[in-house]
Design a protein with these regions (language model features):
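Solvent-exposed alpha-helices and their adjacent loops that cap or buttress functional pockets
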Residues: 15-18, 23-24, 114-117, 122-124, ...
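Active-site glycine-rich loop that binds ribose-phosphate moieties when present
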Residues: 105-107, 136-149, 153-174, 207-212
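Anionic-ligand binding region
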Residues: 194-219
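General beta-strand structural signal in soluble alpha/beta enzymes
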Residues: 24-26, 58-63, 104, 122-127, ...
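Glycine-rich nucleotide/cofactor/substrate-binding loop typically near the N-terminus or early
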Residues: 28, 33-35, 41-98, 219-234
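N- or domain-start disorder-to-order transition segments that initiate the globular core
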Residues: 1-20
Length: 306
């Protein structure tokens, strides 16, 4: 038995893959661990609607009933959004969840893994995980970065989550040979903010150019994925200095309460939401919608290439 035996792809998605039509993978951690019910369910429907509106097929991923699900029906989306007993699954957790039949929400790393197994090359998310602040002492580095180094999926995101050490995250990606491509920008975005103070490797002018870059990477046999950095729309951007103050307060709270490991990111995002009066969640929604839109356009262009 191989890992592909655990794969369960919705018929509509499988048909699109077989016919070479554009498909965009979506994660489920943002649903189960990123926002409350029923707002998360509305968000899930909105994202899928945006993907379809751009001419692609949405493929939300999860682990349910011992299966790697690619495409969720209404009942399965409800399960992920109500999040009763739903765990957060990274690569290390996959075998446990498959063996025990537990329900798990997919992180960036796990979504990349599942998408690759299904033959999906394009994935939209909010922001990737990376090297945490203080990682020189804690060694807290997201598995997302190793997945980007080895799994052939392009991840469209609003940069790295601003709670991270963005400079070290970019250094790690460079070491692992992962290209960081900006969507019509020279600046690497910091999730809620359009600029982080760091630069992308390449500024691509449009979806067609990005599609050609990633296809060429895989055509010539280079391993791994690509990080496509798509800044949050200007009207939803939050002030960088204000966000740094908020993030530092949330980090202090996490340290005081002994929060670490996989609990760190959900804790920080929840407290940042509270400290910004909900403003950060509104920005999070809009950047995720924008990433889904751009990812769909890249997927459409990718499927046109010979």
């Amino acid at each position: 038995m191989t890992i592909k035996d655990y794969l369960s792809v919705a018929p509509e998605i499988q048909q699109a893959i077989d016919e070479g039509r554009p498909v965009v993978a979506l994660e489920s951690t943002i649903l189960s661990h990123g926002m409350p019910y029923p707002e998360n369910l509305e968000f899930a429907h909105n994202v899928e609607k945006i993907v379809r509106g751009e001419g692609a097929i949405p493929a939300t991923t999860a682990i349910i009933g011992g299966k790697l699900k690619v495409g969720l029906n209404a009942g399965e989306l409800e399960i992920m959004c109500k999040a009763n007993g739903v765990g957060k699954v990274s690569r290390r957790d996959v075998a446990v969840y498959l063996a025990t039949g537990k329900t798990g929400a997919t992180t960036v790393a796990t979504t990349m893994l599942i998408a690759s197994l299904a033959g999906i090359r394009i994935f939209a998310t909010g922001g990737i995980g990376g090297v945490h602040r203080g990682a020189t002492e804690t060694m807290d580095i997201s598995a997302d970065l190793q997945e980007l180094a080895h799994t052939p999926v392009a991840v469209i995101c609003a940069g790295a989550k601003s709670i991270l050490d963005i400079g070290l995250t970019l250094e790690y990606l460079e070491t692992m040979g992962v290209p960081v491509v900006g969507v019509d920008t020279d600046d690497f975005p910091a999730f809620y903010c359009r600029r982080s103070g760091f630069k992308v490797d390449y500024n691509a002018k449009d979806a067609n150019e990005i599609a050609r870059i990633i296809k060429t990477k895989w055509d010539v046999g280079l391993e791994g994925g690509a990080l496509i950095a798509n800044p949050i729309p200007k009207e939803y951007e939050l002030d960088f200095d204000e966000m740094e103050t908020v993030i530092n307060r949330a980090l202090s709270m996490a340290k005081e309460q002994g929060i670490h490991g996989k609990d760190t990111t959900p804790f920080l995002l929840a407290h940042i939401k509270d400290l910004t009066g909900g403003e950060s969640l509104a920005s999070n929604l809009q950047l995720a919608y924008n990433n889904a839109r751009v990812a769909s356009r890249i997927a459409v262009e990718y499927c046109k290439l010979p």
